[in-house]
Regions:
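Conserved PLP-enzyme active-site core in the AAT-like
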Residues: 3, 11-16, 43, 64, ...
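Conserved N-terminal alpha-helix of the aminotransferase class I/II PLP-enzyme fold
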Residues: 46-94
Length: 250
């Protein structure tokens, strides 16, 4: 590929080139670019089903990207201010689990709010890491849980100086943000990683007057969801990492 810029769309452009070749498919998916399922073609449109194709050399492979997917990940990392970006399948759940599984091992402690997504708990079950919960305050008027107070994070770190990481929701499901910069700083001062579940904060990277995003705050890893708040189709995610870390992208 030529020089990359933020106006480039490597994967889409590769799909368009492939579509124009009028390849006759003998592989998956079974609808054979709409030929085998006219009802689906009528519902989604011929162009859409023509682009629903399997991994092959012109389109790269997500398991080991070497061309257009790699280029797209590099552009994503640049756009989000991360050192690396990784496109994921399996929802932001898989991105969050990747962060936890790659940061903690059996017996390691991880400090996190009680209102984390269940994907975090699933990851702890898988790898045997030990949760150290911080109970967020509840807004009595709205009836919703708030973010992690920096004082409570400091107490948890003091009581568990051997913890490996701190995980933060940015924002919570209700749009509540913690003091992310201060939490990142505190975690790093105690040689702990800071992981951020940013499933509902993709827009923080591009909007004006937005709360600070994970990469700007110096977090080590963050998981963002492009479909929840980034405007893409359902089930598109990413993981990213900071200057010396990575980004997981759903």
């Amino acid at each position: 590929m030529g020089i990359l810029s933020q106006t480039s769309a490597p994967v889409y452009e590769a799909l368009e080139r492939f579509r124009k070749k009028r390849v006759v498919p003998f592989d998956v998916p079974g609808h054979k670019r709409g030929r085998g399922n006219p009802e689906l073609r009528e519902l989604l449109g011929e162009k859409c089903v023509n682009l629903d194709v399997n991994s092959m050399k012109p389109l790269d492979n997500l398991c080991h990207p070497v061309s257009v997917i790699r280029d797209a990940e590099e552009l994503a990392a640049e756009a989000f201010g991360a050192a690396h970006a990784f496109f994921m399948v399996g929802g932001t759940t898989s991105s969050v689990q990747s962060m936890v599984l790659s940061s903690c091992k059996a017996g390691d402690k991880i400090i996190l709010p009680r209102n984390v997504h269940k994907s975090v708990i699933n990851a702890l079950v898988l790898n045997g890491a030990i949760p150290v919960y911080i109970n967020p305050q509840v807004d009595s008027k709205l009836g919703i849980s708030l973010g992690m107070e920096i004082g409570e994070v400091a107490k948890a770190i003091k009581a568990n100086p051997d913890a490996t990481a701190v995980l933060v929701n940015n924002p919570t499901y209700y749009g509540i943000c913690s003091d992310l910069r201060s939490i990142v700083k505190l975690a790093h001062e105690h040689n702990m990683l800071c992981l951020v579940d940013e499933a509902h904060g993709t827009h923080f990277y591009f909007g004006k007057n937005m709360p600070v995003n994970a990469m700007a705050a110096g977090a080590d890893m963050a998981s963002v969801s492009m479909h929840k708040s980034g405007g893409s189709l359902y089930l598109s995610w990413k993981e990213k990492t900071c200057a010396d870390g990575s980004l997981l992208w759903e």
